[in-house]
Amino acid sequence: MIFIDACFRKETPYTPIWMMRQAGRYLSEYQESRKKAGSFLELCKNSDLATEVTLQPVEILGVDAAILFSDILVVPLEMGLNLEFIPKKGPHFLETITDLKSVESLKVGVYKQLNYVYDTISQTRQKLSKEKALIGFCGSPWTLATYMIEGEGSKSYAKSKKMLYSEPEVLKALLEKLSLELIEYLSLQIQAGVNAVMIFDSWASALEKEAYLEFSWDYLKKISKELKKRYAHIPVILFPKGIGAYLDSIDGEFDVFGVDWGTPLTAAKKILGGKYVLQGNLEPTRLYDKNALEEGVEKILKVMGNQGHIFNLGHGMLPDLPRENAKYLVQLVHAKTRR
C-alpha cells in the first residue's frame, strides 16, 4: 500500500494523498446516504451505510486511503453521556462531567460495545481495493474531555480550564480513564482491519504550552507508545491542531505528525521532519479556486520534496467545496510527484 509505505518513509511511486473529512456533505452521494440513515448518529451506527460513505471518496476522488466514517464522540456516548446532534449547531451532551463522582460514574470497557464501528471496518476492508489503506481513528483524551465537561464545542473552554487549574486531579482521572478506553478501542479497530490509526487532538490549541504537554501530549504519547508496542507494523498518526509554537517539545513513539494549515511546513520539516513523516497541510479554502489550489500545492511540494510526506489538507473539507476541485487536487498531486 502506497499510503502505508509513505508512513514508514519507504519509496513510493508518488506522494499519497487523502483528505480529512473527505466523506462529507460536499458529496451528493454522502447526502443521500445520510438521508437514508435518518440522522448523523444513525449513519455512524448503521454499518452498511457507514461503509458506503467510507468508500465514496475513494471511488469518486481516487484518494490513496479511506478513513473510517464515524465520530470521535461515540466513546463518551457509550461511557454513559447522552449525545444529540443539533442541526447547524453540532454535538451536545445532555449530561456533563463536573466532579470526581461524575468521572467515577462513567462506564468502563465500553470499547467492547462499539461493534457497529468494527463491523464498518471489516465490511469496508472487504470492499476496499488491496492497494488502498483504511485509516481508523479516535479523538484525543483532552479533546474528548472538553466536550464531556463543556457539553458541546466551546470558544473559551472555560469549564475545562477551570477544572484543569483548580481541580487537576479530577481532569487527570478523566484523561486517564479515556486513555485506557482509547488504547483498547484503537486496538480493536486494528484487529477489525484498519491499516493505520490517527488520533485527532482538535482542541490542542486551547492550552498554553506547559498545560498542553501535561494534560494532552503526555496522554497521546502514552496511547501511541502502547499501540506501537502491540502493533509495530501499524502506523500511528497524531494530529494536534494549532500547536505550531510548541513543535520543539514534540516527541514520542509514533510515525506521522499531522500539520495544520496555520503551522508553516518549513518549520515543521526543520524541527520534526528528521524523525517523523509529515502529513498536510493545504489550507482547505484553497479548494474553492483552482489557481489558489495549484499555488498551494506548488508551495507544499517545494518544501517537502519526494519523501517523508503525505499530502492532506491542514484541516477538514468544508461542506460547500466543489467536488471537481477535490478530484483535481488528487490528480494534481499524483501527477506532480510521480517519480
From Swiss-Prot:
Subunit structure comment from the entry: Homodimer.
Coiled-coil zones: none
GO biological process, alphabetically ordered: protoporphyrinogen IX biosynthetic process from glutamate
Identification of the protein by name: Uroporphyrinogen decarboxylase
Alphabetized Gene3D superfamilies for the sequence: 3.20.20.210
HAMAP family: URO_D (MF_00218)
Major subcellular location class: cytoplasm
Transmembrane segments: none
UniProt-listed Enzyme Commission number(s): 4.1.1.37
Top-level taxon: Bacteria
Gene Ontology annotations for the cellular component aspect, listed alphabetically: cytosol
Binding site for substrate: R21, Q22, A23, G24, R25, F40, D71, Y147, S202, H315
Biological role: Catalyzes the decarboxylation of four acetate groups of uroporphyrinogen-III to yield coproporphyrinogen-III.
Pathway(s) this gene product operates in, as recorded in its UniProt entry: Porphyrin-containing compound metabolism; protoporphyrin-IX biosynthesis; coproporphyrinogen-III from 5-aminolevulinate: step 4/4
CDD domains listed in its UniProt record: URO-D (cd00717)
Residues marked Transition state stabilizer (site): D71
Catalysed reaction equations from the record: uroporphyrinogen III + 4 H(+) = coproporphyrinogen III + 4 CO2
Family of the protein in this entry: Belongs to the uroporphyrinogen decarboxylase family.
GO molecular function, one term: uroporphyrinogen decarboxylase activity
InterPro entries reported in the protein's UniProt record: UROD/MetE-like_sf, Uroporphyrinogen_deCO2ase_HemE, Uroporphyrinogen_deCOase
Subcellular location(s) per record: Cytoplasm
Organism placement in taxonomy: Bacteria, Pseudomonadati, Campylobacterota, Epsilonproteobacteria, Campylobacterales
PROSITE patterns xref list: UROD_1, UROD_2
Enzyme class: lyase
Pfam families: URO-D (PF01208)
